[in-house]
Amino acid sequence: MKQALAQKARIPLYRNPAMRGIAAQLAVLAIVVWALVTIFNNTVANLRVRGIQTGFDFMDQVAPFAIGFSPFIEYKLGESPYWLVFLIGIQNTIIVSILGIIAATIIGFTVGVMRLSPNFFLSRFALLYIETFRNIPVLLQIMFWNFAVFLPLLPFPQQSLGAGWGLFLNNRGLYLPKPVPAEGVGIWALLAAFIIGIVAIVVLSRWARRRQYLTGRRPPGVLYGLLVMAGLVALAFLMFDAPLRFERPELGRFNLSGGIQVPLPLFSLWFALSTYTASFIAENVRGGIASVSRGQTEASQSLGLSRAKMLRLVVIPQALRVIIPPTINQYLNLTKNSSLAVAVAYEELVSLWAGIALNQTGQALVIIAMTIVVYETLSLITSAILNIYNKRVQLVER
């Protein structure tokens, strides 16, 4: 026994499987680092030979071009620097990504449930939608909706379609009332009322869930929370004499002025990305629902649950563990596909920063590297948030 242990202790390091694995990983890491350093040195040397100076000094220079859409960051032609252009590009990318994710999720879940509907026409319509939208390149869809549908079919600003309450739609975009806060403490009271209302919705929805576990009946907790929010907001308006007013768009001689303009390229891009991504999410939903044991649906039907309650209370909660992982990938694809906005002149990160700013400054290495880092960061943040939610909906086994 002692001889066997002594012989095992004398095994050379090069024959130890663990040490060989570590050595192989270190060798691969060294090769990757060497390749990256070589590429960087060659790039810097080639730029130096051509007299091109690279660095971040250009970020403080004034950008000599106009930006048409920046809802949250103020940009002034001839005054704003390039770093502000970079932030506006990130802002516009995040806007279309968030709007697209919300719309694609709603459409995808709806179509996915319709795909399994016993109604022949609903299920066939869902199948036609999925097979049509997911088999056409997304760039072609973006250009189709913008140049072949919305741009020629929507009227000119003088004949704008109005829906009341200051809503107008024409071939330049969608115009909405703009909220303008009043000075003083009233706007802060209104904001506090809104936040308290959100907290009330969360608290009352959890209370309703606990009541359902105890009694079998679920009170309308979300509705109660919405009523609390509406009451608090109305109270703030009455006490502080309308701390928030809305500036409506007004039709001038040639165009609309005032309010908020959602440019047509943004609307076209959002519509195309939402409908395209929703076709893949619908298949994820269909597969997730199909993965739930048939015995679960039969047990729900035996308890007298309607199809809507069966889906909401039994099937979909179990299907989420299958639906969410591939859906995360579709959210990431939607964010990256937003870079195709340059085809319809929407001013997002690639169009503004990796397009106009790059052509003006010539700092290709720095600008492209920053663009890559932004998309990588957005993808990691999206994945992290959804992975946290995915862990919460996983089945807990004993």
Predicted features, each with a name:
Residues 2-398:
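Transmembrane alpha-helices and adjacent helix-loop boundaries
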